[in-house]
Amino acid sequence: MQAQESKRPGTLYISWGYNTEWYTNNSIHIDQPSLNSKYEIVKIRGEDHRGWDKSLLKQDLTIPQYNFRIGYFFNQNQDLAIEINFDHTKFIVRQGQQAQIKGIFTGNQVDNTVNFTEINGFYYFLNNGANFLLFNIVKRYPIYTTANNTFKLDLMGKVGIGPVIPHVQNSLFGLANDPSFQFGGWNTGIETALKATIYRYVYLELSQKIDYSRYSNLKVYQGTARQNFACYELILSLGLNLKLR
């Protein structure tokens, strides 16, 4: 009886792309015990900062809002994968809006509006990244394949959970924090994509994603901030498949 060597097919893939986002309005909760301040900035509006729409080829690839994926299709049908999914997104509180401040500030009850501008002492950036990291399960649904297998079109479904790693920079009432990266909470996301593969190895992927993030213990001057928001994201990526045997 002849033993047969069991071969488990697999495909490693890697991609790089760029994104844009739209965020839900959200409240930022500030706690500064040493200043006797505990208040919220109510239903503030935030926006992204694409970067790739201005002189993309004249700056480092990692300065604009980018996306990185690395994954592995592990089953016989090559339709199930695990994936590390990183989105370098940016969240910036929109300058010039009238922001409601409600709670306790320096021991006094407040409920008023401020002009949220840098010249007035206010800015709030997750600008070197709101930074969503997800560990995904991926499912592939074939749509179309040419007879000679030189072109394939697939629908991809992805779902995952993971940490957020924001870069936090802000000033509130003229009091600025020390900007830094930190582990700042968690996020979960669901993503669908159309994936066009050419000659088996190169692919272009157009994705849409809904992500929900909860941030906590974000550094502000002598205190912390917390917030949560959802965002809708569009992503275009270029990738490479590597067959493993």
What is each stretch, according to the model?
Residues 26-30, 34-43, 193-245:
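Predominantly the C-terminal beta-signal and adjacent terminal strand-loop region
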Residues 26-33, 95-101, 166-176, 217-223:
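Outer-membrane beta-barrel translocator domains and adjoining extracellular loop/strand segments
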Residues 53-56, 119-125, 172-181, 218-228:
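Extracellular loop and loop/strand-boundary signature of outer-membrane beta-barrel proteins
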Residues 69-170, 239-245:
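Gram-negative (and chloroplast) outer-membrane scaffold detector with strong preference
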